[in-house]
Design a protein with these regions (language model features):
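Non-catalytic signal-transmission and effector/linker regions of two-component phosphorelay proteins
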Residues: 1-21, 115, 122-135
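Conserved acidic carboxylate
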Residues: 26
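Acidic, metal-coordinating helix/loop segments flanking the phosphotransfer/catalytic sites
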Residues: 48-66
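Acidic catalytic/metal-coordinating carboxylates
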Residues: 51-54, 77-83
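Active-site residues of response regulator receiver
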Residues: 70
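Hydrophobic/aromatic residues positioned on beta-strands within the core alpha/beta folds
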Residues: 100-101
């Protein structure tokens, strides 16, 4: 299976404006590892989870600036994870939530304070959503 994003075509990797703590919840290991590596190169601190259940465990015990979650996963999918986020104490809710999916459309998240990114995506698009800028 191929990766669900494409690296930025530029030779210089864009950097985030500031250091961010990102929780990346993605069940597809190659995609999870590639996004994590590139987000770290862009200046983020990244923690990864294989599914919503593992991601929720991290959300209950740590604080994150951004939750970046796939929507379709085993055990607990992204939709259920987003529902749990709504019930977290304010201090443990991520400041920003970005849902990624190759199967659903943004309309599947209507009424939720969530940004949507369709797979496949370009890293530049994700960095723009996070407030990144070129070096």
């Amino acid at each position: 299976m191929s990766s669900s994003f494409t690296p930025a075509p530029d030779t210089e990797l864009p950097r985030l404006d500031r250091k961010m703590r990102i929780l990346l919840v993605e069940d597809h290991a190659p995609t999870r590892m590639a996004i994590s590596r590139l987000m770290r190169q862009a200046g983020a601190e990244v923690l990864t989870a294989r599914d919503g259940e593992e991601g929720l465990g991290y959300l209950l015990t740590q604080r994150f600036d951004v939750l970046l979650t796939d929507l379709r996963m085993p055990k607990m999918d992204g939709f259920e994870l987003l529902q749990h986020c709504q019930t977290l104490p304010e201090s443990h809710r991520p400041k920003r939530v970005i849902a990624i999916s190759g199967e659903y459309e943004a309309g599947a998240l209507s009424g939720q304070p969530v940004q949507f990114l369709a797979k496949p995506f370009n890293l530049d698009v994700l960095l723009d959503m996070l407030g990144g800028k070129p070096n």
